[in-house]
């Protein structure tokens, strides 16, 4: 359940997270392990 940097296909903005992800991962803007636009965590 950790966070990791995503590729260019997975991005999120500070105003909208999750649904804007183009990859099979969900963006976690609240994650502080990386930039808000490149911090993702698996849905599971």
From Swiss-Prot:
Keywords: Cadmium, Copper, Metal-binding, Zinc. Disulfide bonds: none annotated. Pfam families: Metallothio_5 (PF02067). One of its GO terms (biological process) is response to copper ion. It comes from the Eukaryota. GO terms for molecular function: metal ion binding. The keyword Membrane does not apply. All cysteine residues are arranged in C-X-C groups. These are thought to be the metal-binding sites in other metallothioneins. This protein binds cations of several transition elements. Thought to be involved in metal ion homeostasis. Belongs to the metallothionein superfamily. Type 5 family. This is Metallothionein-4. The lineage of its organism: Eukaryota, Metazoa, Ecdysozoa, Arthropoda, Hexapoda.
